[in-house]
Regions:
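Alpha-helical transmembrane segments of multi-pass inner-membrane proteins
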Residues: 12, 108-140, 151-219, 229-241, ...
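A membrane-periplasm/extracellular boundary helix in multi-pass inner-membrane enzymes
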Residues: 218-261, 275-283, 291
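Short, aromatic-rich membrane-interface segments at the entry and exit
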Residues: 23-35, 80-83, 179-181, 202-206, ...
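Hydrophobic core segments of transmembrane alpha-helices in multi-pass, intramembrane catalytic enzymes
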Residues: 27-38, 83-95, 154-170, 202-214, ...
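Membrane helix-loop boundary segments at the extracytoplasmic
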Residues: 17-24, 324-327, 356-394
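Hydrophobic transmembrane alpha-helices and their immediate junctions
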Residues: 215, 326-366
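Long extracytoplasmic/lumenal interhelical loops at the membrane interface
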Residues: 261-275, 283, 287-327
């Protein structure tokens, strides 16, 4: 019976990585199934040892503990507090995953399941140019128009950028020439889907981030500098060839210039929030205003004719500012600790692929958090917390051996 439960748990975890890029509802159901199966299968001692050895797990638990602490001094309504507890619940769930994804076989299966899911999204994105797919979110055929299949283009671009990194790493590590060609093709098609088939400006930036991580983490010596120069030239060519990318950057520049007068645009709204949120933080710099408090407290600083509408009170489009407003320097530091622990785990692994992917994930999370609430927004938080759990498990499983000191006579 126990072996069957463990098999079901492994299947549920694999299913989670296969389906979360496409269905939040199914991912949430699998989360519940995983928790129940995790409780049934027991083996708590071994799981505790895995959690104990994983600094990413401790960082995630610390961050959620700070969210719980914020309940006791928050002026927010119970609806807002409950919303935050639910949103950040994926942090302790990630720790459950870190204790359960114990074998190399299961870890590889989970990563490959995610790659398969994103492969389906990638194929669908390209087919969307010519055919109106019934499962696609967008229904506008053609080239140089935005296409996203599930959810929103922001989250699709985040995950697609990570797929580019996976494909590039596997290109240089695959021993088979045909496999190298196939993975290189995946990286190219995924990159073009971001630059020419999406209107997400953050996606363009995140693509540059993963390319930089790949060049400076996976390559060495002359190959590294050759790739860096070639990459810069290619990005200039891409910018020149993508009308969609040029239009989006020109729009961003225009919105930035008019930010003082037009605060309802995407860029103007962010700039306005980046100005008023620090004023809120300054009132309670150490512990913040409490869990869920941003939604109501920020309204005291809003002075625009439209009032404190949902676009302002939802979140400040910056995870660092969000934690600082609700949880002060303590929450801000805990989030930095999470990012640093991911990078530290990457440095401890003996597997070059895992090292590059974990550094890339940490970089994606950090950069995306400058313009989005990465751990609060539903689809983004699914990706970052699950992948953080998986890659930290793989880094722990393949960690470098501790050098032994030879005794001298």
């Amino acid at each position: 019976m126990l072996k069957k439960s463990e098999a079901f748990l492994s299947a549920a975890i694999t299913g989670l990585f296969l389906f979360f890029p496409m269905s939040l509802g199914l991912a949430s159901s699998l989360m519940l199934a995983i928790v129940l199966l995790w409780l049934v299968t027991g083996n708590l001692k071994a799981r505790w040892l895995r959690i104990k050895a994983n600094p990413v797990a401790w960082a995630a638990l610390l961050l959620y503990a700070i969210v719980l602490l914020g309940i006791f001094y928050s002026p927010a309504s119970w609806n807002d507090i409950g919303l935050h507890l639910t949103k950040y619940l994926k942090l302790p769930f990630a720790v459950i995953l870190m204790s359960a994804i114990a074998t190399d076989k299961l870890q590889k299966r989970c990563l490959n399941a995610f790659v398969m899911a994103m492969g389906f999204v990638l194929i669908s994105t390209w087919l969307n140019i010519w055919w109106d797919l019934p499962w696609s979110k967008t229904h506008n055929q053609g080239w140089n128009v935005t296409h996203h299949v599930f959810g929103d283009y922001i989250t699709q671009n985040i995950m697609m950028a990570f797929l580019v990194l996976v494909a590039l790493v596997r290109t240089i590590r695959s021993p088979n020439t045909w496999h190298k060609i196939a993975w290189a093709a995946v990286a190219l098609l995924a990159s073009i889907s971001i630059t020419h088939l999406s209107e997400g400006r953050v996606g363009y930036v995140l693509l540059w981030v993963v390319l930089a991580v790949f060049v400076f983490s996976a390559l060495k010596g002359r190959a590294m500098w050759l790739a860096a120069v070639s990459g810069a030239v290619i990005m200039v060519v891409v910018l020149a060839s993508s009308g969609l990318m040029r239009d989006r950057f020109e729009l961003a520049f225009t919105e930035m210039q008019r930010a003082d007068a037009e605060k309802m645009t995407s860029v103007g709204n962010r700039i306005y929030l980046y100005k008023i949120t620090p004023q809120l933080i300054a009132e309670a710099p150490l512990l913040g205003h409490g869990t869920g408090s941003y939604h109501s407290e920020i309204c005291r600083f809003v002075n625009i004719p439209q009032g404190c509408h949902g676009w302002i009170s939802w979140h400040p489009h910056n995870q660092f500012l969000f934690f600082a407003a609700d949880h002060g320097a303590l929450g801000f530091a805990a989030y930095l600790f999470l990012l640093i622990s991911m990078a530290w785990m990457a440095r401890q692994t003996a597997d070059p692929e895992i090292r590059v992917l974990l550094i890339g994930l940490a970089a994606l999370l950090a950069v995306n958090s400058l313009t989005n609430a990465s751990l609060w927004s539903a689809r983004e938080s699914h990706f970052f917390t699950y992948m953080m759990a998986l890659l930290s498990c793989r880094a722990l499983y393949h960690r470098k051996p501790v050098p032994t000191v030879q005794a001298t006579a």
